[in-house]
């Protein structure tokens, strides 16, 4: 979905945790940078009881509503504090009483980007947001940004954007977004192509030098069109014969943002980047955007 037609613009799942507030702050800066509306969405799982409880049920429901309003207000405050005098075009808030994961996945169909904290407390403290973010990585219909508390780069950071490239459709979509992010942030782009998931061990019968030459050509071809479209972005290529997740984690220590595809192939056909994206999203300490193919 294009940014212009996305109802929610940048959609942030909020729950009152420190990670949630960090997600709001990051999303707010992204909304200002892109001039997109931002929507703060808090979902409360309905109270489920196995027997009539009368006033107890009513009290619990009322407590949920009061607590939910506090979460929304806290998210608004986090947004305001993160921006200073800057403001996104529009700020919307939504409070929904429903099951958390299905509601977020459904809402993602109308968002340009969904942003969530890496971990936090779900409805009534029963559901870790870590499990929610994992579900979104696999099922959301838009790119998903995973934000860790207190470890994101500062808004004026000159650290590069890091993108993982493997040649899959999801990787191509990730490359497009990574170039755009680097251009808007006015920073360099590091393009990492790790072309095997077997580790740095020789395989009998394979000409590794010839394979490396071919993989370097593939990486150059994948980047050529985007470098023409974004001549302002300086690109650093990194080609390694090793596991993608390992090198993405290592390179992320000098980056401000990591962008990867949701699914693709690893070094060989059939090795899904899905496992790589999940590992990176939950291990890297900087913001990670996981992109689905268009």
From Swiss-Prot:
Was identified as a high-confidence drug target. Induction: Constitutively expressed during exponential phase, normoxic and hypoxic stationary phase. GO terms for molecular function: ATP binding. The keyword Lyase does not apply. Disruption phenotype: No visible phenotype under normal or hypoxic and normoxic stationary phase growth. Belongs to the universal stress protein A family. This is Universal stress protein Rv2026c. ATP 2 binds at residues 164, 197, 261-267, 275-277. Keywords: ATP-binding, Nucleotide-binding. Signal peptide: none annotated. ATP 1 binds at residues 13, 117-123, 131-132. It holds the Pfam family Usp. It comes from Mycobacterium tuberculosis (strain ATCC 25618 / H37Rv). The keyword Manganese does not apply.
């Amino acid at each position: 979905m294009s940014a212009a037609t996305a109802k929610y613009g940048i959609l942030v799942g909020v729950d009152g945790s420190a990670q949630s507030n960090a997600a709001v702050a990051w999303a707010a800066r992204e909304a200002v940078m892109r001039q997109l509306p931002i929507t703060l969405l808090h979902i409360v799982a309905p109270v489920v009881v196995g027997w009539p409880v009368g006033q107890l049920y009513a009290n619990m429901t009322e407590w949920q509503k009061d607590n939910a309003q506090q979460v929304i207000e806290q998210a608004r405050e986090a947004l305001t504090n993160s921006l200073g005098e800057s403001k996104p075009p529009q700020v919307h808030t939504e409070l929904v009483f429903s099951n958390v994961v299905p509601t977020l996945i459904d809402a993602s169909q109308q968002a340009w980007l969904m942003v969530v904290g890496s971990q936090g407390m779900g409805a009534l403290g029963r559901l870790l947001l870590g499990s929610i973010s994992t579900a979104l990585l696999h099922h959301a219909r838009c790119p998903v940004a995973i934000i860790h508390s207190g470890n994101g780069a500062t808004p004026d950071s000159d650290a590069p954007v890091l993108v993982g490239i493997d040649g899959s459709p999801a990787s191509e979509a990730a490359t497009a977004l990574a170039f755009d992010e680097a251009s808007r942030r006015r920073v360099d782009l590091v393009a990492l192509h790790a072309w095997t998931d077997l580790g740095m061990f020789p395989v009998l019968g394979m000409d590794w030098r010839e394979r490396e030459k071919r993989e370097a050509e593939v990486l150059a071809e994948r980047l050529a069109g985007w470098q023409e479209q974004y001549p302002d972005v300086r690109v650093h290529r990194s080609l390694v014969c090793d596991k993608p997740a390992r090198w993405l984690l290592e390179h992320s220590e000098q980056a401000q943002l990591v962008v990867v595809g949701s699914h693709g192939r690893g070094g060989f056909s059939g090795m899904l980047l899905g496992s790589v994206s999940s590992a990176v999203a939950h291990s890297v300490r900087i913001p990670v955007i996981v992109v689905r193919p268009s």
